[in-house]
């Protein structure tokens, strides 16, 4: 029943928007942007709701319990669907052809598949062992159905309304697509995917072990690769790439709430706060806010990278979250300044460091979040 509601509502709303706005391009774009913001908001809220997917481990330990259960298919579905949050938003708010191609030819098929296998998701959402807020089954069914309908209609309206099609005769477009999609999947790897595919263990990585050094090297190499690939591209392309990474950081951090909402997980620690600061700087186009976020975060980020607080399990949930978040907190401002989306730091900007750090210390002292 819910699959029929998802597909019919997506079809009807898409048709209405396209018909009513067929002669009003700005109207269609504004509606599309509004639908995208609603979609991201719904997805953001869903991270706070119960979900037991974190317990799907390919033979490994988690919080003192060994799990043998695997569900590769659902993890793959989720992985593909998870790209919607950053890909659809970037595709709608910019005119980058790669992200628009990915929205229509990758994200849309995964959204349709997710709707077809709707019950596979609900099994984990309604599992009593899941962390997060447990709400009524009726609400969870309707809430996720609405999210899926939005995920389907957004790329349809975008592609049909703008008459966007893949340029099959352009070799560069093929290369960009087949290199770009794996890159997007890599940086948007859900933290529950690695234990699902690789399993985990009871071992904790050590400082400056091969595990640690590979992570440090990969972080700087990725930042340099992004810079050298896009440094001579148009402002529109550079802006869309940086916006994408800002969104990746934002949704990666908030996926942490799959493990439940606690005071310590609120965005008051600086690396967590950066996820909100950088996004706000993009929305407001505020270089002061961006510099504030960068300067206030850089000391803590470098400290976390060089002297990491590793947990148990090389590929476990918490270690993957730690690695991805701190890499992104370093990469995002580096490429934003390197690609000249925001100006590089001036001496005057250094004053924001003291403001940011003072606010951080105050929040940590009041809320007791200095400890992880």
Where are these regions (language model features)?
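Short aromatic-rich membrane-water interface segments that cap or initiate transmembrane helices
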Residues: 1, 63-79, 131-145, 204-214, ...
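Membrane-interface helix-boundary motifs at transmembrane edges
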Residues: 20-35, 91-103, 161-172, 229-241, ...
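A glycine-rich, hydrophobic loop/mini-helix early in the fold
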Residues: 35-72, 234-279
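Aromatic-anchored segments of alpha-helical transmembrane domains
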Residues: 40-48, 106-120, 181-190, 247-257, ...
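C-terminal membrane-adjacent module
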Residues: 118-200, 341-372
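Membrane-interface helix caps and helix-loop-helix hairpins in membrane proteins
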Residues: 121, 134, 257-265, 284-288, ...
């Amino acid at each position: 029943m819910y699959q029929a509601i998802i597909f019919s509502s997506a079809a009807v709303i898409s048709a209405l928007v396209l018909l009513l706005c067929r002669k009003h391009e700005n109207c269609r774009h504004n509606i599309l942007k509004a639908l995208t913001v609603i979609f991201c908001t719904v997805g953001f809220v869903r991270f706070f709701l119960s979900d037991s997917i974190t317990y799907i481990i390919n033979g490994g330990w988690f919080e003192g319990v060994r799990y043998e259960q695997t569900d590769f298919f659902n993890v793959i579905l989720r992985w593909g669907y998870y790209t919607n949050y950053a890909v659809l938003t970037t595709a709608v708010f910019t005119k980058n052809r790669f992200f628009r191609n990915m929205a229509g030819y990758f994200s849309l098929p995964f959204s349709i598949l997710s709707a077809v296998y709707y019950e596979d998701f609900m099994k984990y959402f309604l599992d009593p062992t899941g962390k997060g807020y447990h709400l009524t089954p009726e609400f969870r069914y309707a809430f996720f159905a609405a999210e899926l309908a939005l995920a389907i209609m957004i790329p349809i309206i975008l592609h049909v309304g703008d008459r966007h099609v893949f340029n099959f005769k352009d070799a560069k477009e093929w290369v960009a697509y087949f290199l770009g999609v794996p890159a997007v999947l890599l940086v948007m790897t859900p933290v529950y995917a690695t234990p699902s595919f690789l399993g985990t263990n009871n071992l904790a990585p050590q400082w400056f072990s091969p595990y640690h050094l590979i992570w440090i090297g990969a972080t700087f190499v990725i930042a340099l690769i992004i810079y050298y690939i896009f440094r001579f591209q148009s402002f529109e392309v550079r802006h869309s790439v940086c916006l994408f990474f800002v969104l990746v950081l934002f949704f990666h951090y908030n996926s942490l709430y799959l493990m439940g909402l606690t005071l310590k997980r609120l965005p008051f620690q600086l690396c967590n706060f950066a996820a909100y600061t950088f996004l706000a700087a993009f929305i407001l186009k505020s270089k002061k806010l961006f510099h504030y976020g960068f300067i206030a975060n850089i000391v803590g980020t470098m400290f976390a990278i060089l002297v990491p607080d590793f947990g148990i399990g090389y590929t476990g949930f918490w270690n993957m979250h730690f690695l991805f978040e701190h890499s992104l907190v370093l990469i995002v401002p580096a490429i934003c300044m390197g690609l000249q989306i925001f100006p590089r730091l001036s001496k005057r900007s250094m004053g924001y460091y003291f403001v940011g750090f003072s606010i951080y210390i105050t929040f940590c002292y009041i809320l007791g979040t200095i400890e992880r």
